């Protein structure tokens, strides 16, 4: 009876709102070699880029991933070239020597800005590839071909 009362009392109360967390879904894809697929559903702006980056980093570390495909097709990217350079530097400083490959799957309208990100990260030691073609991204991330360092 006490349990019923407790439920009834708590049923009408609302929990305090949580701070907005980036919606990052992760799945380990069991190919040879395996990779971590992350799907991001958030608007990426100057204000949200650090929390989004931290959420992605947490998933990579939690899964011990060496290859990561980040699907940004359900996100909107509203970053300046300067912001993209900042993200590239953060990515390299966190994952140079850790990630073997990083693929970004983006909407066609976001491809131009992400193509700036690709060489910025790759030149800092994290092989990166940006595309709007899902098959191309999956092929590249799972490829066994050794990349030049």
Descriptions of predicted regions:
Residues 2-149:
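Amphipathic, Lys/Arg-enriched alpha-helical "gate/interface" segment within cytosolic domains
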């Amino acid at each position: 009876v006490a349990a019923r009362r407790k439920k009834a009392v708590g049923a009408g109360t609302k929990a305090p709102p949580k701070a907005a967390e980036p919606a990052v879904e992760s799945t380990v894809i069991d190919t040879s070699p395996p990779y971590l697929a992350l799907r991001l559903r958030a608007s990426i702006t100057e204000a949200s880029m650090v929390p989004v980056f931290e959420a992605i980093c947490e998933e990579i570390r939690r899964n011990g991933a060496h290859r990561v495909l980040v699907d940004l097709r359900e996100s909107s990217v509203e970053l300046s070239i300067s912001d993209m350079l900042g993200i590239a530097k953060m990515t390299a400083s966190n994952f140079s020597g850790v990630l073997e490959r990083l693929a970004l799957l983006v909407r066609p309208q976001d491809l131009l800005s992400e193509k700036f990100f690709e060489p910025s990260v790759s030149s800092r030691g994290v092989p990166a590839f940006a595309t709007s073609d899902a098959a191309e991204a999956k092929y590249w991330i799972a490829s066994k071909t050794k990349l030049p360092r």
